[in-house]
Swiss-Prot record:
The gene is Fam170a. Keywords: Activator, DNA-binding, Metal-binding, Nucleus, Phosphoprotein, Transcription, Transcription regulation, Zinc, Zinc-finger. The lineage of its organism: Eukaryota, Metazoa, Chordata, Craniata, Vertebrata. This is Protein FAM170A. Residues 271-281 have a biased composition (Acidic residues). Acts as a nuclear transcription factor that positively regulates the expression of heat shock genes. Binds to heat shock promoter elements (HSE).
Length: 333
């Protein structure tokens, strides 16, 4: 009896262990339940299938790439057996290739849109001036006293596309634009002190190179004055270069010319609206005057009476005159 009980106990334990092992095998092999096996990405793959579908803008681009990707999309909605699996080479390499080709194209599209927004024409506002003793006067005047009385004539020129170079001045500080090699503050003082200690007649001081004067400080007879910083430039090209690459000098007149163009554009739009309103008022006035003239004439016609209704002492109708003549003739005869 004891041996039988032991055998039954052992058989029950063996059956339990067999059931646990079967459940583990079912979990480790999902092909028997119809769930497709998850494929780990290879070494050369760029991204997984989820990243691939997030990058592609439309599913039509996915279909014509390869037959393996079409099979993958077609069979993903249906449970498949281990025999119907798509080969790993087709199912894994095609999404990675498409992901690597679609993501950079998306980035290039966005950058091209930003460049198109930045690359716009721009108006530069300047004034042609003459220089007399280092003072800029108006172009048309001969004396400085007359230039103060006359209003300066401002002109404009349009820069070609691609005006702005680099980042806008609001996002860039002047200190960051300066070179790191340039000494600042105390370093300049320490460098200048040993040079100043040398006697004035020494050859070291004589051989020291002099700084080149900038072009805008050179005396000139006439030029073009920037309306933002009032600097005079010899040629129109130098003025355009100043507005275009002014950030290199530590400041820029770019914002001034943009706001000036906006203000002038708004003023022109307001003036055109006022002119249109005045034109409509002028066209409506003669119509109203004609209508007023027609109204009293109609009233006068209504107020007139025929000859028969008028009193005889004032007006005589032609019929009454004939009757009187006939009556006089009959009485005379």
């Amino acid at each position: 009896m004891k041996r039988r009980q032991k055998r039954k106990h052992l058989e029950i334990e063996e059956s339990k262990e067999a059931g646990i092992s079967k459940s583990q095998e079912d979990i480790s092999h999902p092909e028997s339940t119809g769930v497709p096996k998850a494929q780990s990405p290879g070494v050369g793959e760029v991204s997984s299938a989820s990243e691939y579908f997030s990058c592609v803008s439309s599913p039509q681009k996915l279909i014509h790439r390869s037959k393996g990707t079409w099979k993958l999309l077609q069979d993903s909605s249906k449970p498949r057996s281990p025999l119907d699996q798509v080969p790993e080479g087709e199912a894994t390499t095609a999404p990675s290739q498409q992901a690597s080709s679609s993501c950079p194209s998306y980035k290039t599209c966005v950058s091209s849109l930003c460049m198109n927004k930045e690359e716009r024409g721009m108006k530069i506002y300047y004034m042609q001036v003459q220089m007399k003793k280092g003072v800029a006067i108006s172009w048309d005047t001969k004396e400085t006293s007359e230039s103060l009385e006359k209003q300066p004539r401002m002109e404009e020129a349009t820069l070609p596309e691609g005006v702005w170079v680099g980042t806008p001045p609001s996002d860039v500080s002047t200190r960051n634009l300066l070179s790191d090699s340039e000494p600042i503050g105390e370093e300049k003082e320490h460098e200048e002190k040993p040079e100043s200690d040398s006697p004035p007649g020494s050859p070291a001081v004589e051989e020291r190179p002099r700084a080149k004067t900038p072009d805008w400080l050179v005396t000139m007879e006439n030029g073009f004055r920037c309306m933002a910083c009032c600097r005079v430039f010899a040629t129109m090209e130098s003025l355009q270069e100043h507005v275009q690459y002014g950030i290199r000098e530590g400041f820029s007149c770019h914002v001034f010319h943009l706001t000036m163009a906006q203000l002038i554009g708004s003023m022109e739009s307001e003036s055109t609206q006022e002119e249109e309103e005045d034109h409509t008022e002028e066209t409506e006035k003669p119509k109203e005057e004609k209508a007023e003239e027609q109204q009293p004439t109609e009233e006068d016609v209504g107020m007139k009476k025929p000859w028969s209704q008028c009193p005889g002492c004032v007006f005589d109708s032609p019929k009454d005159r004939r009757r009187r003549k006939d009556h006089c003739d009959n009485s005379g005869s």
